[in-house]
Amino acid sequence: MTEARPVEVRFGEDAGPSRTGISSRRDAYAAPSKLHLWVLLVLILSLISTFTVDTAAASLKFGAVPFSPGSTVRANVPLSPQEKSYAAQGGNPVPANAAAVLATPSNFDPTKSWPVLVICSTSDFKRQNRDDLADFYRRVGLSEGWVLLAGDGPQHAKNDNVAWRESMTMAAVDALHRSFPGSEKWPIACAGFSGGGKGVGYVAPFLAKNGCHVIGVYMTGANEDHLSDGYARLQPGPGFLNTPIYFSAGHEDRIATQEQQYAVVGMIKRTGFKRIRIGTFRGGHEVNDAQTSIALNWFRELAK
């Protein structure tokens, strides 16, 4: 008869699996392999990177209002004495602040330079600049890598005149410059549709007169030339005549016909503007996304 022997389990040395199939203590607490260390290192670095990005995004503020890249933020921003004097023209009560709206691409990093599209809307139907930003320009502008900006009063103006639009827009631009150091050097283009295409004729030279680097004016459905008058009144300097001007005209536009818009182009040429381009599209009195994309890319190309 075979003699029974006790099962021997050894600890403290590399004995390999025991006769019971249970690993030894050294196997159970074996040192991690190089692969495990690399995986752990990658996970740690990933967590640090994510935390850094999240912290940077959370620290972004526009006019003291926190926001994340890829979002649209609205902030109440102060008016300078000059902006208050403009706002008061036409008998308007001066508001305590302006309402500035900023839309940024998902990869927005304020330490880099960004082109800024400043929006001018018509005053018809009580539209505000921020309305046109959201309805007509935001999707294409962000996809093309632009920051979009609009300035309005906190309420509708009693007399929604050019001076009012200039003051509120400049307040938004000032807020941009205060929020992001170095942004005073960012290139700016101005866009206006219908009545906004007329108003932009004053807002663009006004911004240039006040030190902004204006690289383009984009007009859609404008049947009158106000840019020549804006240039004469505001006197931003002869260099402003080199600003690229892009006209977008719908074939079926009955409010601003192609004939009228080509006539406006002729007037602007006679004023002395040198870089003028007109694009047409199948459509009526509307902002065309493809034309917006062409205009923005043209401005950036010429600004290089």
Functional labels for PLM-detected ranges:
Residues 4, 10, 15-20, 27-36:
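Short, low-complexity intrinsically disordered segments enriched in A/P/G/S/L with frequent Arg
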Residues 38-50:
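Bacterial N-terminal signal peptides
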Residues 53-114, 206, 263-266, 276, ...:
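A domain-start/cap signature at the N-terminus of enzymes
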Residues 106-113, 158-195, 208:
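Gly/Ser-rich "nucleophile elbow"/oxyanion-hole loop immediately N-terminal to the catalytic nucleophile
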Residues 116, 120-172:
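Active-site machinery of serine-nucleophile hydrolases
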Residues 186-239:
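Primarily recognizes the serine-hydrolase "nucleophile elbow" in alpha/beta-hydrolase
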Residues 216, 221-292:
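The feature captures the conserved acid-bearing segment of alpha/beta-hydrolase catalytic domains
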Residues 292-304:
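Catalytic active-site module of serine/aspartate enzymes centered on a nucleophile-bearing elbow/loop
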